[in-house]
Regions:
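Structural signature of FAD isoalloxazine-binding scaffolds in flavoprotein oxidoreductases
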Residues: 92-109, 124
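Structural motif
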Residues: 12, 21-22, 103-105, 112, ...
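N-terminal non-catalytic cap/leader segment that marks the start of a structured domain
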Residues: 1-96
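Beta-hairpin (beta-strand-turn-beta-strand) motif
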Residues: 80-83, 102-104, 118
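Short, structured patches in soluble enzyme cores that scaffold and shape functional sites
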Residues: 5-7, 101-103, 126-128
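A structural-propensity feature for long, helix-poor, extended segments
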Residues: 108-129
Length: 130
């Protein structure tokens, strides 16, 4: 089950991602869960999964994605977690590097990613687990 936060017709919501659009869980479960973070914290995945086979409420063409969790408390990251990546940078420590990210450094699906002027390229290693 793929989940996302999004805007549709100027209304913020969250839902289940399907190829043809979104099942709007905000509309269906919003009285109990105000956003995707609340759904996850409130163990609402079982409730959400009841709608998996439903038709979409929102066409994909009208969706503007938001960062998955808009106001995370913490973003803890693991860097250099692949052996091949460590070799690329001549790192011999077998333990991965831990670092933090800030909420305002997130971007949404299909949103532009801005490269800092002092960087020559983007780093291609990026993963997110919630």
């Amino acid at each position: 089950m793929k989940l996302a936060s999004f805007i549709y017709q100027d209304i913020r919501s969250f839902g289940i991602v399907k190829a043809e659009g979104m099942i709007d869980l905000g509309r269906r479960l919003g009285d109990r869960y105000g956003d995707l973070k609340a759904l996850l914290q409130g163990n609402g995945l079982a409730e959400a999964s009841r709608y998996l086979d439903d038709a979409v409420d929102v066409p994909m063409g009208g969706v503007t994605f938001l960062p998955v969790i808009e106001q995370p408390e913490k973003i803890l990251c693991v860097g250099m977690n692949y052996a091949e990546k460590r070799k690329e940078f001549d790192q011999h420590n077998p333990a991965p590097t831990l670092f933090v990210r800030f909420a305002d450094s997130q971007t949404a699906h299909n949103a532009p990613v801005l490269k800092p002027r002092h960087s020559r390229e983007f780093d291609y290693e990026g993963e997110l687990a919630v």
